[in-house]
């Protein structure tokens, strides 16, 4: 299934990153070289000088801890999706330049087809994660967490800090050029 494994070991002041073959034996110390038991499988060991234990080895993320209980999440999520559905229906009804548009909302899934040239947006609830997921033909998939209070909260993509409504405000006006678009006036975008 996988040709190799990735192993990271850290020792005070040093780290060793190695790709090991399937039958390689783990190294005892970071300074040792990994020798595969099968000659066809190569191994690479890289010594990393001046490794800092406090260094973040992943992308920076914005804190988005949701404090909503289940019932509040359901209400906030439903209010958000209902408002988006109503607004998309209003926008597509007034969009004379778009052919074949359709807006459908059922069982927590909002599907907005903006025609063959522009694609389909899918916005849906993810109750187990207390998230709203977006699939955009322009920017791809994103997962939004609710941040803030019910009175002053918004749905945030934790990797960029951009809200759901900000992303829609960025993408949709480029499609609906003949009318003004303002997603930032909808609930839960403050």
UniProtKB/Swiss-Prot annotation:
Pfam families reported in the protein's UniProt record: Frataxin_Cyay (PF01491)
Chief site of localization: mitochondrion
Annotated keywords: Heme biosynthesis, Ion transport, Iron, Iron storage, Iron transport, Lipid metabolism, Mitochondrion, Oxidoreductase, Steroid metabolism, Steroidogenesis, Transit peptide, Transport
Alphabetized InterPro entries for the sequence: Frataxin (IPR017789), Frataxin/CyaY (IPR002908), Frataxin/CyaY_sf (IPR036524), Frataxin_CS (IPR020895)
Keyword match Zinc: no
Free-text disruption phenotype from the record: RNAi-mediated knockdown results in nearly absent pupariation and reduced ecdysteroid peak level required to proceed to pupal stage. RNAi-mediated knockdown in the prothoracic gland results in delayed or absent pupariation.
Disulfide pattern: none
N-terminal signal peptide: none
Superkingdom of this protein's organism: Eukaryota
Coiled-coil boundaries: none
GO cellular component terms, A-Z: axon cytoplasm; mitochondrial [2Fe-2S] assembly complex; mitochondrial matrix; mitochondrion
Gene3D superfamilies from the UniProt entry: Frataxin/CyaY (3.30.920.10)
Localization of this protein: Mitochondrion
Reactions catalysed, as given in the entry: 4 Fe(2+) + O2 + 4 H(+) = 4 Fe(3+) + 2 H2O
E.C. number(s) listed in UniProt: 1.16.3.1
GO terms classed as biological process: [2Fe-2S] cluster assembly; adult locomotory behavior; axonal transport of mitochondrion; determination of adult lifespan; heme biosynthetic process; intracellular iron ion homeostasis; iron ion transport; iron-sulfur cluster assembly
GO molecular function: 2 iron, 2 sulfur cluster binding; enzyme activator activity; ferric iron binding; ferrous iron binding; ferroxidase activity; iron chaperone activity
UniProt keyword Mitochondrion present: yes
Family: Belongs to the frataxin family.
Self-association state and partner proteins as the record states: Monomer (probable predominant form). Oligomer. Interacts with IscU. Component of the mitochondrial core iron-sulfur cluster (ISC) assembly complex at least composed of the cysteine desulfurase Nfs1, the scaffold protein IscU, the accessory protein bcn92/Isd11/Lyrm4, and probably fh/frataxin.
PANTHER family named among the record's database cross-references: FRATAXIN, FRATAXIN, MITOCHONDRIAL
Functional note: Promotes the biosynthesis of heme as well as the assembly and repair of iron-sulfur clusters by delivering Fe(2+) to proteins involved in these pathways. May play a role in the protection against iron-catalyzed oxidative stress through its ability to catalyze the oxidation of Fe(2+) to Fe(3+). May be able to store large amounts of the metal in the form of a ferrihydrite mineral by oligomerization. Required for ecdysteroidogenesis in the prothoracic gland which is necessary for larval to pupal transition.
Protein name, as recorded: Frataxin homolog, mitochondrial
Originating organism: Drosophila melanogaster (Fruit fly)
